[in-house]
C-alpha cells in the first residue's frame, strides 16, 4: 500500500531500475506519514561515503508532536540497502546522466520503505511527447465512452 507517490518523477525521468530501501525514521515521522503528512516531490537521493541518503523530502510533524524535541521536517534521512546494491548504484550513478530519485513511500511488514529509481533525465521534447500520449489516451477513452 503506497503512502506517498512521486508522480513528477515519472514525468521528468526515464526510470530504468527500481530498488526498495528501508528508511531510518524517528517516531514522530512514522506517525506523520501514517496521517499522510509527507511530500517527496522535491526529494532526491545522494551517495556519501558509500551510504545513501534521502534529501529534500518534507514530513510535516503532527500538532501533537512531543514538546521536548524540535522536529525538523526536511532533515536528511538515511536509506538502508544491501552493500552490493549500494556498490551497484554507485557504479551506475557515476556514469554520465544517471541519478537516483524517490518514487514512493509504502508499508511492508509494518515498516516504511522507500522505492528509489535509477533514472535518466528526460529532455524537453520527451516531456512534450509524454504529455501528447497522455492527452491522446484520455481523448481515446472519452470517445470510447461516448460511443457505447
Swiss-Prot record:
Superkingdom of the source species: Bacteria
UniProt family annotation: Belongs to the SmpB family.
Classification lineage: Bacteria, Pseudomonadati, Pseudomonadota, Betaproteobacteria, Burkholderiales
Compartments where found: Cytoplasm
HAMAP family: SmpB (MF_00023)
Any one GO molecular function term: RNA binding
Protein name, as recorded: SsrA-binding protein
A single Gene Ontology CC term: cytosol
Record keywords, A-Z: Cytoplasm, RNA-binding
SUPFAM superfamilies recorded: Small protein B (SmpB)
Location (main, coarse): cytoplasm
Biased composition (Basic and acidic residues): 126-142
Claim: Endoplasmic reticulum is one of the keywords in the record: no
CDD domains per record: SmpB
Spans annotated as Disordered: 123-148
Task of the protein: Required for rescue of stalled ribosomes mediated by trans-translation. Binds to transfer-messenger RNA (tmRNA), required for stable association of tmRNA with ribosomes. tmRNA and SmpB together mimic tRNA shape, replacing the anticodon stem-loop with SmpB. tmRNA is encoded by the ssrA gene; the 2 termini fold to resemble tRNA(Ala) and it encodes a 'tag peptide', a short internal open reading frame. During trans-translation Ala-aminoacylated tmRNA acts like a tRNA, entering the A-site of stalled ribosomes, displacing the stalled mRNA.
Pfam families documented for this protein: SmpB (PF01668)
Amino acid at each position: 500500500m503506497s503512502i506517498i507517490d512521486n508522480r513528477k518523477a515519472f514525468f521528468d525521468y526515464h526510470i530504468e531500475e527500481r530498488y526498495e530501501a528501508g528508511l531510518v525514521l524517528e517516531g514522530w515521522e512514522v506517525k506523520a506519514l501514517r496521517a499522510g503528512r509527507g511530500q517527496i516531490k522535491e526529494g532526491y537521493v545522494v551517495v556519501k561515503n558509500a551510504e545513501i541518503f534521502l534529501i529534500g523530502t518534507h514530513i510535516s510533524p503532527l500538532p501533537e508532536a512531543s514538546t521536548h524535541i524540535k522536529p525538523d521536517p526536511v532533515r536528511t534521512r538515511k536509506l538502508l540497502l544491501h552493500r552490493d546494491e549500494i556498490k551497484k548504484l554507485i557504479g551506475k550513478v557515476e556514469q554520465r546522466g544517471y541519478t537516483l530519485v524517490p518514487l514512493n513511500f509504502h508499508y511492508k511488514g509494518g515498516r516504511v520503505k522507500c522505492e528509489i529509481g535509477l533514472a535518466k533525465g528526460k529532455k524537453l521534447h520527451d516531456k512534450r511527447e509524454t504529455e501528447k500520449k497522455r492527452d491522446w489516451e484520455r481523448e481515446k477513452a472519452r470517445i470510447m465512452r461516448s460511443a457505447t
